[in-house]
Amino acid sequence: MIHFILLFSRQGKLRLQKWYTTLPDKERKKITRDIIQTVLSRGHRTSSFIDWKELKLVYKRYASLYFCCAIENQDNELLTLEIVHRYVELLDKYFGNVCELDIIFNFEKAYFILDEFIIGGEIQETSKKTAVKAIEDSDMLQETMEEYMNKPTF
């Protein structure tokens, strides 16, 4: 099970966070700071897996963003890397070569895509095609609602 997902920049700025375990806000901030510092201090040629407290951290850098997941010790690290890669593929499909600015200015869409893909720390939808279709359907529904709300009533 994934306990949380963090996306942060090379400068250490948190861009997205999703927690699947309940923790107090103060503890979340401390954990986030600690993980960002730990990951950023590692060399580029080191392993993408870190034993951290009672969890394992699995991270991958894409362009200027780090995608980091905390998983249980018995979970498969390579499968988690594939989950991260699939999330990046979904973001790429939606935004067209996603970058940090896409996450910053469209964070609600990034969260929506993540929620369409992972629920409760477990993978929800393995099919990229099905996930993209659900995202496109949601966009179409939102556009239809906006058009409907903008029509004058007589």
UniProtKB/Swiss-Prot annotation:
GO terms for cellular component: AP-1 adaptor complex; clathrin-coated pit; early endosome; lysosomal membrane; trans-Golgi network membrane. Gene3D superfamilies: 3.30.450.60. Belongs to the adaptor complexes small subunit family. The keyword Lipid biosynthesis does not apply. Adaptor protein complex 1 (AP-1) is a heterotetramer composed of two large adaptins (gamma-type subunit AP1G1 and beta-type subunit AP1B1), a medium adaptin (mu-type subunit AP1M1 or AP1M2) and a small adaptin (sigma-type subunit AP1S1 or AP1S2 or AP1S3). The gene is Ap1s3. InterPro entries: AP1_sigma, AP_complex_ssu, AP_mu_sigma_su, Clathrin_sm-chain_CS, Longin-like_dom_sf. This is AP-1 complex subunit sigma-3.
